[in-house]
Amino acid sequence: MNAFIQGLPKVELHLHIEGSLEPELMFKLAKRNGIDIPYSSPSELREAYQFEDLQSFLDLYYQGANVLRTEQDFYDLTWEYLEHCKADNVIHTEIFFDPQTHTERGIDFDTVLNGISRALTDGREKLGITSQIIACFLRHLSEESAMETLQSVLKHRDKIIGVGLDSSEKGHPPAKFLRVFQQAKEAGLLTVAHAGEEGPAQNITDAIEMLEVSRVDHGVRCVEDEALVGSLIETKMPLTVCPLSNIKLCVFDEMGQHNIVELLRKGVAVTINSDDPVYFGGYMTDNFLAVNQAHPMIKEELAKFTLNAIDASFIDNELKAQYRHKVEQYVAQHSSM
């Protein structure tokens, strides 16, 4: 089954590009930009990736992002991620970036976006990987800061498909950003939001009803509300679940306790994603393997994660049909093996 998982076409919908910064690249960029980092080697830095909760991870995440200064830095970061996508048979990815993480420290919005966008264009042409960009607001910052960021996003509608909401969920409910999301929707942007990771099931309901999201990022605490689970099934609201992330951040103690396969079998439109793969110990294939090891599935169930992701993606129906066919063909070819 491992070989089947490796070759399975995959679609990633929940990936923070800053969270794909490999320690080796971090050291390279620190040297390039003359920045001191408080670790003597990439391996020492890797050893620091032990987290008690979301906040302990975010502290290290923001520290790492500090080495990203130039358009070329953001290009290199994104290109390395795309090479991992190619190795994992990811055919389409929709990446998050956090503008405020960079603008708050004096990096121009366009510097960030142009580097990411240029790499994604090369990824389409050289690797055959299609992509979309989603700009996320940091929920621990103010509504005013998010509104300012939205104005920058709106200048780049040709590159940015939608907006999201991430960072620490505790104490920052969806309602805080209602007006920002209303303005984004009025401008024609699609919307997604992190909810129900560390926060309660009510945050999922609020993200759907208040922010009118097309997808819920994480959403695993939906099981605390039976009516909500029923609604997710009925409306086919996608959840972009990140299994290894959930273990690393102690949302679940171990993969055997994770509810993603239970939700899949109930009919919830769950997808598998890597979130911040460098910090959480795995890219897409690693996440699929970890889930299947703890909850053995048949090939059709594994493929359903990709089919759900295709349906939930922000691409046109023609490309969705092509990708569905690709997955169905792959399963058919391997059904007797």
UniProtKB/Swiss-Prot annotation:
Residues engaged in binding substrate: D276
Molecular function terms, GO-annotated: adenine deaminase activity; zinc ion binding
Annotated site residues (Important for catalytic activity) in this chain: H218
Active site (catalytic residues): E197
Protein's name in the database: Adenine deaminase
Residues noted as binding Zn(2+) in the record, renumbered to the chain: H14, H16, H194, D275
Listed EC numbers: 3.5.4.2
Protein role: Catalyzes the hydrolytic deamination of adenine to hypoxanthine. Plays an important role in the purine salvage pathway and in nitrogen catabolism.
InterPro entries given in the database record: A_deaminase_dom, ADE, Ado/ade_deaminase, Metal_Hydrolase
Family annotation (Pfam families): A_deaminase (PF00962)
GO biological process: adenine catabolic process; hypoxanthine salvage; nucleotide metabolic process
SUPFAM superfamilies membership: Metallo-dependent hydrolases
